[in-house]
Amino acid sequence: MEQTFEAFVVRKDDEGFRTGIEQWTTEQLMDGDVTVRVEYSGINYKDALASTENGKIVRSYPFVPGIDLAGTVADSSHPRFQPGDKVLCTGYETGVSHFGGYSGLARLNGDWLVPLPNGLDARDAMAIGTAGFTAALSVQAVLHAGAEPADGPVLVRGAAGGVGSMAVAILSRLGFHVTASSGKKDEQGEWLKSLGAAEVIGREEAAPAARGALAAETWSAVIDPVGGQGTADTAKYVKYGGAIALSGLTGGGGFEGTVYPYILRGVQLIGIDSVYCPMDKRLGVWSKLAGEWKPEKALSSGIQEIGLDGLRPALDRILAGGAVGRYVVKLG
C-alpha cells in the first residue's frame, strides 16, 4: 500500500540547485528488501557536502541525503529482518548513491542493516552514528596496536568534532589519559574536559614545529579524524611503537613527511574505513558501543536534536565549521 511521508530532498535540474522538505510516496523510494520507518538520523560532514551543488557526493538527482538512520522495520523480504525489528544503518551506499535517512521511510538493502543492540535506543544510536562508530574503530585499532593506559597520553585531534568528541569519551571511559587538541580550545575546552579530556590544547600545540625528522616522544597513540599536514607533523611526536588511527581529511587530503617515525620508532599509521567495514566487525563494535564503550558523557551533553525543518541551517553550520558535538534529526 502506498504511503506518504516527508523527506529532505536535494534537486538539480533546469531550475537550478535547491534543497527542501517535500511530501513523497513509497513509489518514489529506491529498490531494497527492507523498508524502515526512520525515527532518527544524524548529520555528518559527508551529509553537509551532499547538500551542496559542488560537494562531489551526489551523482544523480533528485536525492535524499543522510548516511545514518535508525528506526523500525516496516516491511521486509530479507531473511534476517521482520517487521517490528529495531535497526540502524551507517555507511555502505546509504546517503551517497542510495536514498538515505532524511526521510520518514527508507527502503534499503538488508545486508547493510545492524540490529539495534540492547543498551541503545534509536536516538542514542544516531547520536553516536558514523562519527561514534568511526571513533570506536579508531580506538579499537590503537588498542590492537598495543596501546594501554599506562603508556601515557593519547592525543585526539579535532576533538570538538563528532569523531573527536566521541573518541575522547570512549578513551576516557577506558582509563586513558586523553589530550584533546582543537582549534576551538577557548570555546570548547570546558566541554571537552566534561567528556573526559585531561587537558585541552590548541592544534599547533599538538605538534610544535620541529627541525628534525623526529621530535620528543610525547603521544602513546593518536586518534586523527583531521588528516592533512598535521598527520605527518604529529607522527614526529609519537612514542616508540605507538599508532596513529587516521580516519578523515577535513585538514586536507595530503601531507609531506619522512619515513623516520615509522622505521626508527615503529610508529604505525592505520587507516580507518567505517563505510565498508565488514559486518562481523561492525556488529562487534556496535555491541561495545552499547555496553562497555558506551560514550555516556558524550550522549549526555553536546547533542542537539532538530527536526527536518532545522536541517538546512545545521548543514550550513557544519559547512562553515561552526558546529560542535553532534546533531540528531528526529523524524516522525
Q: What name fits each language-model region?
A:
Residues Q3, L283-G332:
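C-terminal hydrophobic helical "lid"/dimerization subdomain
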Residues E27-I43, N54-T94:
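Glycine-rich beta-strand-centered segment in the early N-terminal region that forms part
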Residues D68, D85-K86, L105, P153, ...:
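Residue-level marker of beta-strand positions
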Residues M126-E204:
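Mid-domain Rossmann-like dinucleotide-binding core that forms the NAD(H)/NADP(H) cofactor-binding site
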Residues T90-L155:
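NAD(P)H dinucleotide-binding glycine-rich loop of Rossmann-like/cofactor-binding domains
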Residues A206-E217:
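Short amphipathic alpha-helix with an adjacent loop that forms part of the alpha/beta core around
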Residues L88, S220-I223, A245:
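N-terminal Rossmann-like NAD(P) cofactor-binding module of classical short-chain dehydrogenase/reductase
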Residues Q229-P295, K330-L331:
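Glycine-rich phosphate-binding loop and adjacent beta-alpha segment
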